[in-house]
From Swiss-Prot:
HAMAP family the record matches: MutS2
Keyword Hydrolase belongs to the record: yes
Protein name per the record: Endonuclease MutS2
GO molecular function terms attached to this record: ATP binding; ATP hydrolysis activity; ATP-dependent DNA damage sensor activity; endonuclease activity; mismatched DNA binding; ribosomal large subunit binding; rRNA binding
BP-aspect Gene Ontology terms: mismatch repair; negative regulation of DNA recombination; rescue of stalled ribosome
Taxonomy of the source species: Bacteria, Bacillati, Bacillota, Bacilli, Bacillales
Species assigned in the record: Bacillus cereus (strain AH187)
PROSITE patterns per the UniProt record, alphabetical: DNA_MISMATCH_REPAIR_2, SMR
Length: 786
């Protein structure tokens, strides 16, 4: 990536802001060395990594990166045999703790179900050196001093030192409190000179105390004397201090050697936490500028939704939708110089640079960006004083360099292309330069105030015009990018707002060709149409999102309903099976009793015994069967029943003989030795009549039964449909269904009306309604049963 491109697009300013979010010099070094990548896979991984760190921040608010310092030079010194200071060793211990703490932090989140595959891979490389960490912290205090407990020998030496110091102070304090002390001493204090305890003695009394003079005051009137009586004690104290120093050095060398043994692991851990500091800095920066993760594609197109420049306050900048690379490869932004065109140009460039650096970009979700091998930018007035180049020449030198290197994997940004020279020649050069880079397949965004380039976008298939909206009422740009609408100068409107007379403005209009006026009017209408279309699109998008939300909610409710329905049906089926099984056992017992009755002399069987047995047999049927009375289709053809016909009673699966018809729908039937009333719908005709045989019931068979939750009438004739509805509702009631659906379709509405007219009269219907969204709407009637 060209250094000039990074400079003019203010990439380093973004890095300066990123630096503010690092926790250590390790992370700061990573930021300082950050440059955009051109490798697609690497960029995707960097974006995913930043996204995981952003997820951690959303869930936890921060990451435990405190206490980590750059200890690499200290570790390398330990590796070559140098002795580390207590503070240097303490920094190593703190960094080891920080890396271990970070590892535990990420692993705990993963254990709790948070998906962080990339960060988990990073922390998996951290090797815990807990033993070494504890050795250092056990020997060195938070203030950087070697503590007494570092070794038994050091504790003993320091006990000796404290004892010696106490004895010396006691003797000297006795001297300062003597009767002659006020006369001979300059001050009644005990002090230290050259690491030995002394007292301040007046010059004329130096011989009274004897001993050694270690210092004197500036005036020479006071001598700091070590009295003879404590010289031996001071000597003993100094010997103990030498031993203390030797023991401390031994401890520090021991710890340094242990660091040297683990040096490679420590350095590896440092590299991991440096990367983690860098990664989380990017995530914190994304939060600061309200950035999101872009979708990175390899198809050479970008779609930036509501893009903002990261260096401009998000509260004041106007976001823009910027698309490039699909329907068109070049955007030519025309309009006046003060219209915010350069901000749009820089927004495109800096977003690409940030994305290719693994940074999230200030756009809305689902924005897409592609990878460019080269990004070229000719922006701003960078004329060279040393080379005595004009503005035009300076730009042209840069453009020549761009034309030598640009290809189909390049993004080229031109600001005020062709400016700084004769307008006619500048416009011609601009068109020629744009043609050249477009023909190479590069993606191009160019700004210009030349009106000649307005037609350029209409004459080239892959080029589109754009402009930055200008509010003539406030005389300022709105910075709203209008794709597909060329810019206009607004000179007449601005002049009128500023007070120029209508007469002068009208004369000015007369100096412009009719075609130019028509073009300006056309552009004005395009701007208005663009704004209206954008407003309509925003409203439609809001409705779409609302519809999707409702759809998701309905899907969730349907899934929950189906799950609950299936659970209840399963429970009901299980209960039904248990009841049927119990009924079978009870029926078998009753049948056994009837067999015993048959074996007995039939004349001796009392009527009440038969009635009781019949009642118990009917009561043995499970509840569902008793409600249904075998609600099944009679597979036999319709037959005019007569007394004496043999039939099969479906409830019990037994044959019987018709005795007499007791009502329009019921017959008296002889089943073995039992006589009972049976509905015609509960019997099946048998072709071969037999004489009634009195025999006991042998078996009672159960029968599977199923009724669908919906009835589909589409394609049925009206009469057949009504008959099916009648039977279906009876079946559904017998199945104890609380709710069913009847599908009649929309069509002409005749079948729908017929169904609902019938439902109004049916005594088993509680309420009914049309289907809701997701249930079939007007093509379905949902029936609530009593």
């Amino acid at each position: 990536m060209l250094e000039r491109t990074l400079r003019v697009l203010e990439y380093n300013k973004v890095k300066e802001q990123l630096l503010e979010h690092t926790a250590s010099s390790l992370g700061r070094d990573k930021v300082k060395n950050l440059v955009p990548s051109t490798d697609f896979e690497e960029i995707v991984e960097m974006q995913d990594t930043t996204d995981e760190a952003a997820k951690v921040i959303r869930l936890k608010g921060s990451a435990p990166l405190g206490g980590i310092t750059d200890i690499r030079s200290n570790v390398k010194r330990a590796k070559i045999g140098s002795m580390l200071s207590p503070n240097e060793l303490l920094d190593i211990a703190n960094t080891m703790y920080g890396s271990r703490n970070m590892k535990r932090f990420i692993e705990d989140m993963v254990d709790n179900g948070v998906e962080l595959p990339i960060l988990a891979t990073h922390v998996a490389q951290i090797v815990s050196l807990y033993d070494l960490e504890k050795k250092i912290t056990n020997c060195i205090g938070d203030g950087g001093e070697v503590v007494d407990s570092a070794s038994d020998k050091l504790r003993g030496i320091r006990t000796q030192i404290r004892t010696a110091e106490s004895r010396i102070r006691e003797k000297l304090e006795n001297m300062t409190r003597s009767s002659n002390a006020q006369k001979m001493l300059s001050d009644s204090i005990v002090t230290i000179r050259n690491e030995r305890y002394v007292i301040p003695v007046k010059q004329e009394y130096r011989g009274v105390y004897g001993g050694i003079v270690h210092d004197q005051s500036a005036s020479g009137q006071t001598l700091f004397i070590e009295p003879q009586v404590i010289v031996e004690l001071n000597n003993a104290l100094q010997e103990a201090r030498v031993k203390e120093k030797q023991e401390i050095e031994r401890i520090l060398l021991m710890l340094t050697e242990e660091v040297a043994v683990e040096a490679d692991i420590v350095l590896s851990n440092v590299e991991v936490v440096a990367n983690l500091d860098f990664i989380f800095a990017k995530a914190f920066y994304a939060k600061r500028i309200k950035a999101t993760k872009p979708i990175v594609n390899n198809e050479r197109y970008m779609d930036l939704k509501q893009a903002r420049h990261p260096l401009i306050d998000p509260e004041i900048i106007v976001p823009n939708n910027i698309m490039l690379g699909k329907d068109f490869t070049t955007i030519v932004i025309t309009g006046p110089n003060t219209g915010g065109k350069t901000v749009t140009l820089k927004t495109v460039g800096i977003c690409v640079l940030m994305a290719q650096s693994g940074l999230h970009i200030p756009v809305m979700d689902e924005s897409e960006i592609c990878v460019f091998k080269n990004i070229f930018a000719d922006i701003g007035d960078e004329q060279s004083i040393e080379q005595s180049l004009s503005t035009f020449s300076s730009h042209m030198v840069n453009i020549v360099d761009i034309l030598e290197k640009a290809d189909f994997e390049s993004l080229v940004l031109f600001d005020e292309l062709g400016a700084g020279t004769d307008p006619q020649e500048g416009a011609a050069l601009a068109i020629s330069i744009l043609d050249e880079v477009c023909n190479r397949g590069a993606r191009v965004v160019a700004t210009t105030h030349y009106p000649e380039l307005k037609a350029y976008g209409y004459n080239r298939e892959q080029v589109i015009n754009a402009s930055v909206e200008f509010d003539v009422n406030t005389l300022s740009p709105t910075y709203k990018l209008l794709i597909g609408v060329p810019g206009r100068s607004n000179a007449f409107e601005i002049s009128k707002r500023l007070g120029l007379s209508d007469r002068v403005i009208e004369q000015a209009r007369n100096h412009i060709s009719t075609d130019t006026n028509k073009i300006e009017n056309m552009i004005a209408k395009l701007e208005e149409s663009q704004k209206n279309a954008e407003r309509d699109w925003n409203e439609a998008e809001a409705l779409r999102k609302q519809s999707e939300k409702l759809h998701r909610e309905l899907q969730r409710q349907i899934i929950e309903f189906n799950e609950e329905r299936d659970e209840r049906l399963l429970k009901a089926q299980k209960e039904g099976e248990e009841k049927v099984e119990a009924a079978k056992k009870e029926a078998e017992g009753i049948i056994q009793e009837l067999r015993q009755l048959r074996k007995a002399q039939l004349a001796n069987v009392k009527d009440h015994e038969l009635i009781e047995a019949k009642s118990r047999l009917e009561g043995a049927a499970p509840e569902l069967v008793k409600k249904q009375k075998v609600n099944v289709k009679n597979t036999a053809p319709k037959q005019q029943l007569r007394a004496g016909d043999e039939v099969k009673v479906l409830t019990f699966g037994q044959k019987g003989q018709l005795l007499e018809k007791v009502s329009d729908t019921e017959w008296s039937v002889q089943i073995g030795i039992l006589k009972m009333k049976v509905k015609e719908s509960n019997m099946e005709y048998i072709n071969t009549p037999k004489q009634t045989e009195k025999k006991a019931v042998a078996t009672v068979k159960g029968r599977d039964y199923h009724v669908s939750l919906e009835l589909d009438l589409r394609g049925e004739r009206f009469e057949n449909a009504m008959a099916r509805v009648e039977k279906y509702l009876d079946d559904a009631q017998l199945a104890s269904y609380p709710r069913v659906s009847i599908i009649h379709g929309k069509g002409t509405g005749a079948l729908r009306q017929g169904v609902q007219d019938y439902l109004k009269k049916h005594r088993g219907v509680k309420t009914f309604r049309y289907g809701d969204m997701g249930e079939g709407g007007l093509g379905v009637t949902v029936v609530e049963l009593k």
